[in-house]
């Protein structure tokens, strides 16, 4: 079941990218509307999920009407943020002239694990760099891990490790306090990725239950909410098998 928040958040990301590529605010806002409409049109028969709190003004929560009203405001706030901070946080460029706007990364880590993604923004801050991820939700991320992964990915692919990271909260129109990403290293991430790969290969998926689960579009496939889809295994029998194997070695 698709969520309006995914379509709306993607539309905000797209519109801010259009703005940073040189468009004016009016064009960027129109880019939001066009992208949002296209996303909804791709699934004309779908029942879309609305997240957010229901209020007297928005009795259905953050539905399509909410996003059409609030999405453009997020784009305008971003444009004002860039106007206010461009002297402090100019867009960084790679040596090849590639701008830090949806900067592609696809480095390979130890063990053949390839990480592919796009970094929303990379800003220059005097002699340092700042990686920034745009968030259109109402809650700030609890961890800087995503930013740390981006920093290491940039080091492997572009030869520079950004010292700082921050989330830009589109609803507020401001960045979260910058955090030092120096302690994120390739060795640390490679170890985590290897362990995650082992878990996937063993068909082990541990639910991460948070307040965001209420708006998740795929929770019907998660056994934390739908017991009938739980993996077919017996924890006790697996332990017994492991114990017997060790006894016979």
Placement of each model-derived feature along the sequence:
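Gly/serine-rich nucleotide phosphate-binding loop at the start of the catalytic core
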Residues: 2-16
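Hydrophobic (often cysteine-bearing) scaffold residues that line and stabilize catalytic clefts
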Residues: 4, 8, 67, 71, ...
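Short amphipathic alpha-helical face segments that pack within enzyme cores
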Residues: 11-14, 145-153
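Active-site catalytic microenvironments for nucleophilic, acid-base chemistry
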Residues: 18-22, 152-157
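Non-catalytic protein-protein interaction segments used by genome-maintenance enzymes to assemble
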Residues: 95-149, 158
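Metal-dependent nuclease catalytic regions and adjoining charged, substrate-binding loops involved
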Residues: 96-103, 111, 141-144, 154-249
């Amino acid at each position: 079941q698709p969520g309006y928040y995914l379509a709306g958040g993607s539309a905000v990301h797209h519109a801010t990218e259009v703005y940073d590529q040189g468009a004016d605010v009016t064009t960027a806002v129109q880019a939001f509307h066009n992208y949002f409409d296209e996303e909804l049109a791709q699934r004309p028969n779908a029942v879309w999920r609305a997240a957010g709190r229901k209020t007297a003004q928005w009795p259905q929560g953050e539905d399509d009407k909410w996003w059409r009203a609030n999405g453009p405001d997020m784009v305008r706030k971003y444009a004002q943020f860039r106007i206010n901070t461009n002297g402090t946080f100019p867009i960084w460029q790679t040596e090849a002239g590639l701008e830090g706007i949806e900067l592609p990364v696809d480095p390979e880590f130890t063990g053949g694990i390839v990480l592919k993604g796009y970094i929303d923004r990379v800003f220059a801050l005097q002699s340092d760099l700042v990686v920034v991820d745009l968030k259109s939700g109402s809650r700030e991320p609890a961890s800087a891990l995503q930013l740390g992964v981006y920093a290491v990915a940039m080091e492997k692919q572009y030869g520079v490790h950004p010292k700082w990271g921050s989330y830009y909260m589109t609803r507020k129109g401001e960045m979260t306090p910058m955090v030092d990403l120096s302690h994120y290293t390739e060795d640390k991430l490679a170890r985590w990725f290897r362990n995650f790969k082992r878990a996937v290969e063993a068909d082990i998926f541990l639910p991460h239950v948070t307040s965001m689960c209420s708006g998740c579009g795929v929770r019907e496939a998660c056994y934390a909410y739908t017991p009938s889809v739980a993996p077919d295994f017996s924890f006790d029998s697996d332990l017994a098998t492991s114990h017997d194997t060790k006894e016979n070695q």
